[in-house]
């Protein structure tokens, strides 16, 4: 074999050896990285145990509002946080614990149980202070976040029906008649509450501005400023409430009242209370309507 050929053979051998070694090193490094990532990912049960332990202790430690917000946003989606603030305004209790306050040391009885389909039950306390709260988690990157907590009026229920949107199919407002307009407007409006999107307030305002009279829009802001829930920043005169639950949708009713051209809108909430108010569909020059809520 010539010296030149021997040299080329040696170079090829060294190149293949180097390439194989490099690939092996890359695979080893990738495997190590994956192992570290897996080690960093908390199990759902561990995440809930950690979060609820700190949350319960925060009452004794008297966290500032900013500290509570930071703790919640590190462990729940922004949409869930906004939803839970509305539920808090509705029930006058903290939806994370279904109470206004907790006895010191309650975290000692804390238990977390898997229910299936990303649902878990968090329980703590004893006797009259016992709480068992179902909630749902979603995976976000390498961690889990709370994206729904069962409201207390549903007690121990869990499942996708609690997060459903029965009005999701109503995509537009029907202008074919006054009653169709009112019904479809409310289905669209309520659907935005149920969808729990980040831009909820913007979308609700857009619907009010487009489909309500100026007097109704002003009534919305006046009610917000005069009703007790204003302390927590929530009250919507168009639904006579601070939020809407999927289980209330089947009770939504729109029917003519005794007054000409006036319709009664009503529904029953989780406590069995019947909410009622009167509206008109005001004809516009272009053939459309505007919703006019009648003063109480």
What are these regions (language model features)?
Residues 134-142, 278-287:
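Short beta-strand segments and strand-loop junctions that repeat across beta-rich extracellular domains
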Residues 24, 123-125, 136-138, 266-268, ...:
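Residue-level recognition of well-ordered beta-strand positions that form the cores
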Residues 1-37:
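Bacterial Sec-dependent N-terminal signal peptides
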């Amino acid at each position: 074999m010539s010296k030149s050929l021997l040299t080329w053979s040696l170079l090829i051998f060294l190149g293949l050896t180097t390439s194989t070694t490099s690939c092996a090193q890359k695979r080893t490094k990738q495997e190590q990285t994956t192992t570290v990532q897996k080690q960093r990912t908390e199990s759902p049960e561990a995440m809930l145990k950690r979060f609820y332990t700190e949350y319960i202790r925060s009452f004794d430690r008297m966290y500032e509002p900013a500290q509570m917000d930071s703790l919640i946003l590190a462990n729940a989606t922004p949409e869930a946080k906004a939803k839970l603030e509305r539920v808090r305004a509705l029930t006058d209790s903290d939806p994370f614990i279904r109470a206004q306050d907790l006895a010191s040391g309650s975290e000692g009885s804390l238990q977390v149980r898997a229910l299936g389909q990303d649902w878990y039950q968090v329980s703590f306390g004893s006797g009259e202070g016992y709480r068992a709260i179902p909630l749902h988690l979603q995976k976000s990157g390498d961690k889990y976040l709370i994206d729904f907590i069962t409201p207390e009026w549903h007690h121990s229920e869990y499942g996708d029906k609690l997060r459903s949107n029965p009005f999701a199919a109503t995509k537009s407002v029907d202008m074919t008649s006054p009653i169709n307009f009112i019904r479809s407007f409310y289905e669209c409006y309520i659907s935005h509450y149920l969808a729990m999107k980040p831009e909820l307030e913007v979308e609700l305002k857009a619907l009010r501005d487009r489909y309500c009279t100026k007097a109704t829009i002003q009534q919305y802001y006046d009610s917000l400023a005069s009703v007790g829930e204003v302390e927590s920043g929530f009250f919507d005169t168009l639904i006579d409430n601070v939020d809407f639950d999927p289980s209330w949708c089947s009770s939504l009713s729109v029917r003519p009242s005794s007054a000409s051209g006036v319709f009664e809108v009503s529904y029953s909430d989780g406590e069995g209370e019947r909410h009622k108010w009167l509206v008109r569909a005001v004809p516009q020059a272009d053939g459309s309507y505007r919703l006019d809520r009648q003063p109480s």
